Regions:
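Short glycine/acidic-rich loop motifs that flank beta-strands on beta-rich extracellular proteins
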Residues: 49-52, 71-73, 80-87, 107-118, ...
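Beta-rich ligand-binding surfaces for carbohydrates and other polyanions
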Residues: 380-500
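Acidic Gly/Asp/Thr-rich repetitive segments characteristic of extracellular carbohydrate-active
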Residues: 15-42
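Acidic, glycine- and Ser/Thr-rich low-complexity intrinsically disordered tracts
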Residues: 281, 305-380
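Extracellular beta-strand-rich solenoid/capping regions of secreted or surface-exposed proteins
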Residues: 27, 31-34, 46-63, 70-99, ...
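Right-handed parallel beta-helix
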Residues: 59-65, 94-107, 126-139, 146, ...
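Fungal secretory targeting signals
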Residues: 1-15
Length: 500
């Protein structure tokens, strides 16, 4: 049995260290060595891979010889032109270890990979797995590090240790030209009774540490810093419904969170603070204490959609700058969130959204109404945006092509061009496709080089401003008439109310 093998036999090191080769070199050593095999890479080695490295038995380890913790750690990198996204996978093997190496998904070189995995994929029906002193960065997929659940709550992933890792950057903000979200997590935890401690995460763009339930886990003494170039959704997230929504005995303690460009959330807690707006509450009891939040974090702690006990005490957000309006914008948020933002509230909750017992520190702000989707904040938004010919070219449902203070302009999945103010349509092109644009979308909105604003389906024009040969720029503004097209002399030749 796996547990007996790991218990009674010492680790068996493969001969020497590996200075070159690829995943096949490493996989052969694991496959031939069996349980407890240790594969060590030489210091300063770079291993290019075109497919994932696979653990094959309990107790195996991959590490750098002499266990350095700095830049001399060996690097495993995804090769340009490769279809690989996950670098190391080890589902359901007990006591495996990934230690003292660097993992580079090489997103800039190999490219974003739609549907790609995390740099590290371990977990499953396993116990005692360890990731320690690892640098994981630039994932092609959705996370720098994923400890996956088993899918069976009666036999869960358990007792992992995620220690002293330096993680990031992970992902980018926004969408690509095909409408794919580019963001990624730092640590994605879906494993019970796990210790996540003393990690430093810089530049996560989805969640810094995302806790997928993971009952009994402790998240302690981690440092999470947002990118100075990309928005980050949340530093620590407790918003997902795995384990029937249970966060029983989860402890989030003594972590340091710093916003550079911006974090929407420091610590998000509950079913309704993210974008899901779930109909059921997540459940404790859980403890959030001794955390320090500083810098550009729009809402350091937000709580809504929770039951069965919560303690949030001794957290400090005194170094979050005030007023928030000097560095952030909440004009796309629901009214209760806008009110909390204007009040410069740092710790916020909605009373009816927290059932059963709660112990909240005294500086919590009680919202006037249901606060949902705290991902609505941003850096300060402009009042207008202007595109020249061929600068605006978007696929339907790819996010707003104008994100302004109080207003967004969006090309919808039915090929309708719509301007919304406070979430309500104030203008639309009116041309829609009953069958929709398809998946992948066959619809595009283009402000062409000839000055015509045109929607296309499968290469065929559907709607246009009729300004071909005359238009020079298109400007979207946050007040009526919302969209204007000007000629080379600056004269308005078309807007949403008239054509001249």
């Amino acid at each position: 049995m796996r547990a007996e093998t790991a218990l009674f036999f010492p680790a068996l090191a493969a001969a020497g260290c590996i200075s070159n080769g690829d995943q096949n070199t490493i996989n052969a050593l694991f496959r031939n060595g069996g349980a407890n095999t240790v594969v060590q890479l030489c210091e300063n080695a770079t291993i290019q891979i075109t497919d994932k490295i696979l653990f094959t038995a309990d107790g195996q380890e991959i590490s750098t010889q002499n266990y350095p913790t700095g830049s001399t750690r060996a690097t495993i990198r995804v090769a340009v032109g490769s279809s690989a996204s996950t670098l190391i996978e080890g589902h359901s093997f007990n006591n495996i270890k990934i230690k003292n190496i660097q993992l580079d998904g090489n997103r800039n070189g190999a490219g974003f990979y739609k549907g790609g995995g995390a740099n590290i994929e371990i977990g499953g029906t396993a116990t005692g797995q360890v990731i320690q002193n690892v640098n994981s960065r630039n994932p092609r997929g959705w996370s720098c590090m994923h400890i996956i659940g088993s899918g069976n709550d009666a036999n869960p992933c358990k007792n992992a240790q995620i220690l002293n890792n330096d993680i990031g950057p992970c992902g980018e903000e926004g969408h690509n030209a095909n409408g794919d979200g580019l963001w990624a997590d730092g640590i994605s935890l879906d494993c019970t009774d796990t210790l996540v401690q003393d990690n430093t995460i810089v530049g996560s763009t989805d969640g810094g540490i995302v806790i997928f339930g993971s009952p009994g886990s402790t998240i302690n003494r981690n440092t999470i810093i947002s990118s100075d170039q990309h928005l980050g959704f949340g530093a620590i997230n407790m918003v997902d419904g795995q384990y029937q929504g249970s966060y029983a005995n989860v402890k989030v303690t003594n972590n340091k969170i710093q916003g550079k460009k911006i974090f929407n959330l420091g610590i998000g807690i509950g079913a309704n603070v993210w974008s899901f707006n779930d109909p059921y509450a997540l459940k404790g009891p859980a403890t959030i204490t001794g955390n320090t939040i500083s810098g550009h974090v729009a809402f350091p702690i937000a709580l809504n959609g929770w039951a069965n006990g919560i303690q949030i005490t001794g957290n400090d957000a005194s170094d979050v700058p005030s007023p928030k309006s000097s560095w952030a914008d909440a004009s796309h948020c629901v009214q209760p969130i806008q009110q909390a933002f204007t009040a410069n509230a740092n710790f916020v909750y909605w009373g009816p959204g927290v059932a059963d017992s709660k112990n909240l520190q005294s500086d919590f702000y009680s919202a006037s109404g249901n606060m949902t989707n705290f991902l609505c904040t941003s850096t300060p938004l402009a009042d207008s945006i202007t595109y020249k010919g061929n600068e605006l070219n978007v696929v339907s449902d790819s996010g707003p092509f104008a994100d302004l203070h109080g207003v967004i302009a969006q090309y919808q999945g039915d090929s309708n061009v719509v301007v919304l103010q406070a979430g309500k349509p104030v203008w639309a092109s009116g041309h829609t496709l009953s069958q929709g644009c398809g998946n992948p979308s066959k619809c595009r909105l283009i402000f062409q080089g000839d000055g015509n604003l045109v929607t296309y389906y499968d290469g065929q024009p559907q709607w246009s401003s009729g300004t071909g040969g005359r238009g020079s720029t298109v400007t979207i503004i946050n007040k009526a008439p919302w969209i204007q097209i000007r000629d080379a002399s600056g004269n308005v030749i078309w807007d949403t109310t008239k054509s001249t």
